[in-house]
Amino acid sequence: MAKITGNLVATGLKFGIVTARFNDFINDKLLSGAIDTLVRHGADENNIDTAWVPGAFEIPLVAKKMATSGKYDAVICLGTVIRGSTTHYDYVCNEAAKGIGAVALETGVPVIFGVLTTENIEQAIERAGTKAGNKGSECALGAIEMVNVLKAI
């Protein structure tokens, strides 16, 4: 029985990163964590392109454009949605998650969900590089692994 795994080597790989401007004080940290991790694992900074969109809801469209361009081995999607007093949070979170997942399934390109969906600003800050690590960094690792596992199949 074969065990198929993906290594964490990003040498020669190209990445697209879509980042939401809304809550950019959090998303900047997620983006920095992702880029740092990609480079530490062998990616060339010149092989990492970033696109900024207004908010998390808009991420899937640009992710799809990147995924279908043929330029990228993987696309990383970063954003932050913090619960407010209305149901807007639920719609944005659900549609962003559905859209990002659909892009991966439709294109066959790894598209990594790195949109924080938090109850409050403290939880978002914790996940952007403090107590709970940096989710942007974790998404970069996931992107590298997915590219390599797909190549191994």
Swiss-Prot record:
Annotated pathway: Cofactor biosynthesis; riboflavin biosynthesis; riboflavin from 2-hydroxy-3-oxobutyl phosphate and 5-amino-6-(D-ribitylamino)uracil: step 1/2
Catalysed conversion reaction: (2S)-2-hydroxy-3-oxobutyl phosphate + 5-amino-6-(D-ribitylamino)uracil = 6,7-dimethyl-8-(1-D-ribityl)lumazine + phosphate + 2 H2O + H(+)
Enzyme Commission number, as recorded: 2.5.1.78
Residues at which (2S)-2-hydroxy-3-oxobutyl phosphate binds: 85-86, 127
Keyword Cell wall biogenesis/degradation: no
UniProt GO cellular component terms: cytosol; riboflavin synthase complex
Pfam families (UniProt xref): DMRL_synthase
GO molecular function: 6,7-dimethyl-8-ribityllumazine synthase activity
Key words of the record: Riboflavin biosynthesis, Transferase
Positions annotated as active site in the UniProt record: 88 (proton donor)
Any GO BP annotation: riboflavin biosynthetic process
Family annotation (InterPro entries): LS (IPR034964), LS/RS (IPR002180), LS/RS_sf (IPR036467)
Residues noted as binding 5-amino-6-(D-ribitylamino)uracil in the record, renumbered to the chain: 22, 56-58, 80-82, 113
Domain of life, source organism: Bacteria
Keyword Transferase listed: yes
Family indicated by similarity: Belongs to the DMRL synthase family.
Subunit record text: Forms an icosahedral capsid composed of 60 subunits, arranged as a dodecamer of pentamers.
Function statement: Catalyzes the formation of 6,7-dimethyl-8-ribityllumazine by condensation of 5-amino-6-(D-ribitylamino)uracil with 3,4-dihydroxy-2-butanone 4-phosphate. This is the penultimate step in the biosynthesis of riboflavin.
PANTHER family: 6,7-DIMETHYL-8-RIBITYLLUMAZINE SYNTHASE, 6,7-DIMETHYL-8-RIBITYLLUMAZINE SYNTHASE DMRL SYNTHASE LUMAZINE SYNTHASE
Entry protein name: 6,7-dimethyl-8-ribityllumazine synthase
Highest classification ranks of the organism: Bacteria, Pseudomonadati, Pseudomonadota, Gammaproteobacteria, Pasteurellales
GN (gene name): ribH
